[in-house]
Amino acid sequence: MHFSPPLQKGTLLKRYKRFLADVTLEDGSVITMHCANTGAMTGCAEPGSTVWFSTSDNPKRKYAHSWELTQTQAGHWICVNTARANALVVEAILAGEIPQLRGYDALSTEVKYGHENSRIDILLKSDSQPHCFIEVKSVTLLDEIQGDKGQGYFPDAVTTRGQKHLRELAEVAKDGSRSILLFAVLHSGIEKVAPALHIDANYSQLLKAAQEAGVEVLCYKASLSKHEIRMVSEVKFAHQVTKN
């Protein structure tokens, strides 16, 4: 996924009201931009961090600029625009870069499904195998406090929406379709992923139950720069549970 036109650079002053951020440009002026991230953004939104943003030519947008990447003072790159994760995974699937998801004939996005009025991020279909339902989650929380280098967690805040998605995925698996939770690692410092029991215990418990019901968990890491984002490698998920 190439950024075109090229991203512009600034310095973060503050993020506020969840969806807004004030950024100082290189000429000293300050602009307000949209932040497409509903999470806590722990470690991703420290004042003084370098931010990279895109600009839309859509005149109907209230804020023309969108915060895309953070470059931390520790040198890490983070994609904070969670909308990029789904597009990145779709791109990787179509290019055959995720071996576990090869062999399907059709791909759809944002398809209604389930009993709780949900939409699945990606639906793969094939005449020769069951449908494959894929829910994509961005992983940007790096926590090395315990000395565990490269440890990433999801979620970074309590997520009732994420809990609902796990229930829906579990039901799909029980009905005989293939059901996948795919963690897209969008932080250059994260080398492995674990459920954030210390942040959302209910999510962790539901994830374990979903795996026992047959939900698969995949973790793929992206390479990040101001020029492009692309999936490059599979990383370890720390709590794989086998189906009952």
UniProtKB/Swiss-Prot annotation:
InterPro entries: SfsA, SfsA_C, SfsA_N. The gene is sfsA. This is Sugar fermentation stimulation protein homolog. Pfam families: SfsA, SfsA_N. Belongs to the SfsA family. CDD domains: SfsA-like_bacterial. One of its GO terms (molecular function) is DNA binding.
